[in-house]
Amino acid sequence: MSNHMSIMKFLNQILCLSLILSISMTTLSFAQTCSKYKFSSNNVFDSCNDLPFLDSFLHYTYESSTGSLHIAYRHTKLTSGKWVAWAVNPTSTGMVGAQAIVAYPQSDGTVRVYTSPIRSYQTSLLEGDLSFNVSGLSATYQNNEIVVLASLKLAQDLGNGGTINTVWQDGSMSGNSLLPHPTSGNNVRSVSTLNLVSGVSAAAGGAGGSSKLRKRNIHGILNGVSWGIMMPLGAIIARYLRVAKSADPAWFYIHVFCQASAYIIGVAGWATGLKLGGDSPGIQYSTHRAIGIALFSLATVQVFAMFLRPKPEHKHRLYWNIYHHTIGYTIIILGVVNVFKGLGILSPKKQWKNAYIGIIVVLAIVATLLEAFTWYVVIKRRKLEAKTAQHGASNGTRSQYA
């Protein structure tokens, strides 16, 4: 009974520590700095917004009577060989349909600035006319900062209370060729809605326009909890809880419940991944996708193999056990690897990755301690049974669920 209580205490510690680490998040607030900025050209704008990603700022003056929008887009903290873009999307949120202004420094010290309509995810940002008139287009590059100035002639009646969809972006260059921007982290978050009258800006997803980022987060949470935490925890329960005789057959049902729950949640996460892939034809994460498909396939085989599990005394039970353990540990390894792959794609705040690393470290430490404790209990039990057994034939009663 004491052995059983010790193991249960370890498992409770796993659950508590996992919960604490998973909710240990901090909120990052953005300091308003655009209002203090002074343009060298003495330009003055009525309003400004600190954009939440990519170290960017938008200064603007909106004339609702004429539909004229005068803007200064500032992109700071740039390294050499970078291009930047700011766009209005008249038809939807996001990249496709955006009417962009693109700028990048040239080798002669000047800045090339031009307009580019974006019609697909495979855009090369070629120069072209926008769906509205643009005048006064210019750009400067100084102190690792590009400033783009332009006047846009929007519709006098925007039809949605003066709100526009905006997108801003940056990427690397090869010579004078623009390379695709990164497809993870802040580069996929840089969309928002802006009310030109009130000056209120909000993330596009929060405004109801685009739910892609929210779907990515849901996908990550579902798969992180299922494949990355519950699957390893279920394996720990099966391996170490059954050493306590009083836990037989409870350990088996706890193990099945944990793994079945992980599978159901994991399938939901896998399905959201397929949906995200279908909604983003120009964005591919081949390794992450391949591991995800392999995980789903192996886990599905593992679930259905339970219906073919021989009885403990059957001659084929040994082979089934070898298969079950091999597939199970493969799923755990692939699951953890793919969670880290997903974190690399999402590029969330550092606390998320640190929290997951903490959970995995805790699980690994607990598993190591339980492994040593289990061997101690088993060896001690066998010695005791050898002393008390008649004719040396008794090696303990085997669980029918093992």
UniProtKB/Swiss-Prot annotation:
Regarding the membrane, this protein is recorded as: Multi-pass membrane protein
**Cofactor binding, note field:** Binds 2 heme b groups non-covalently.
Task: Show where the Cytochrome b561 domain sits.
Answer: 183-379
For molecular function, the Gene Ontology terms on record are: metal ion binding
Q: Where does heme b 2 bind?
A: H255, H324
InterPro entries with a match to the protein in the record: AIR12_DOMON, Cyt_b561/ferric_Rdtase_TM, DOMON_domain, UCP037471
Question: Per its UniProt record, what PROSITE patterns does this chain match?
Answer: CYTOCHROME_B561, DOMON
Every copy of the DOMON domain together lies at: 54-171
Supply one GO CC term from the record: membrane
Annotated TM spans? 218-238, 250-270, 290-310, 326-346, 359-379
Q: Where is the signal peptide?
A: 1-31
Tell me which UniProt keywords the record has, alphabetically: Electron transport, Heme, Iron, Membrane, Metal-binding, Signal, Transmembrane, Transmembrane helix, Transport
**Annotated binding of heme b 1, by residue:** H219, H288
Any Pfam family from its record, for instance, is Cytochrom_B561
The Swiss-Prot or TrEMBL record lists the needed cofactor(s) as: heme b
* Localization per record: Membrane
Q: What does this protein do?
A: May act as a catecholamine-responsive trans-membrane electron transporter.
* Description of its domains: DOMON domain could bind catecholamines and thereby could regulate the cytochrome b561 domain function. DOMON domain could bind one heme b.
Q: What is this protein called?
A: Cytochrome b561 and DOMON domain-containing protein At4g17280
Upper classification of the source organism reads: Eukaryota, Viridiplantae, Streptophyta, Embryophyta, Tracheophyta
